[in-house]
Structure formats: structure tokens, C-alpha cells
Amino acid sequence: VIGQAYGGGFYAGQIGVGGVATHYIIVGPVASAQSTLQWKNAMTATTGADSDIDGPQNTADMVADGSATVYPAAHFCNDLSTAGQTDWHMPAKNELEVCYFNLKPTTGNNNTSSGINPNAVPARASNYTSGNPAQTSAAVFQSGGSEAFVTASYWSSTEFSAGYGLAQ
């Protein structure tokens, strides 16, 4: 069930290839797993951090490529230990989109120039509409709830170009 406690965090959905789920997406609890750390502090390319669906590998690539000074957010996620879980990572672009789609905190309009996600389960082939996705039914993720996303852009672990990551 979307928003239900699971694996040290909360179940946010599934990601897959060709409509077949490959893994669950779990978001960490706000109290210990949310950060405003910079994605990257250098204008250099990161070898390998370009997957739209493999946040663990992107995060590992960033950690291997540089120190916490260069990749503060990736190191924060990689080093996180909460509720007995130590396998946290920055979500890849399409993983992050699933989180937004399923855990959208507000009833406000969406940006209608995004939303296509061939890796979501089920896959989404069209952009958002002003009302889709709708506000999540998971109360703790609704505006004012203890786990609600703040109104801001969130970095993904997917590098767009040297020094720039993709955000949702």
C-alpha cells in the first residue's frame, strides 16, 4: 500500500523495465533521511551516474568518484543508517518521479511538461495533467503530515551533464 511503513521507511511504488517490476522504492523517514545537501560541488562529469532507474548504482558511482566534499548528498544517503537499514541511496530520475506521482502532498496543479515515465509500474506514456497526479491518499504524506515532501525540487542521482543532475 502506497505510504505504508516498510523496510525502515515508507513504500512509494515500483520501478521496472517493460512494465515488469524490478524493485520497490522505499523513501526514508523525514526525521532522519531528508537533507538539503548539495548534489555536487564540482563541474566535472561523473563516470556511470547516468541511469534513470538505478539509484543504488548512481549513488555508488558518485561515492567512488569523489569525497563528501564533492558529493555531499550521495555520501549522506550512502552513509545513512535508520531503522536498522543501511542500503539507502539517492533515487534515480525515474525512481524520484514515482515518489512524486504516488506521494504528491498537495492538491495543487502539476507541471504539465513532465510525467512520462516508461519505468514506472504501471508505465506512464503521457505528461501530467493539472490534476493528475492527484494528492496522495497517504495522510502522513499530505501537506502538513509528518512525512510530506516540501514544495521544492529534489535532486535525483541521475547526472544530466558534467556538474548537473536531474531534479523532480
Where in this protein do the model-derived segments appear?
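Short, compositionally biased
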Residues: 1-85, 102-105
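An exposed tryptophan-centered "aromatic clamp" motif
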Residues: 66, 74-87, 93-168
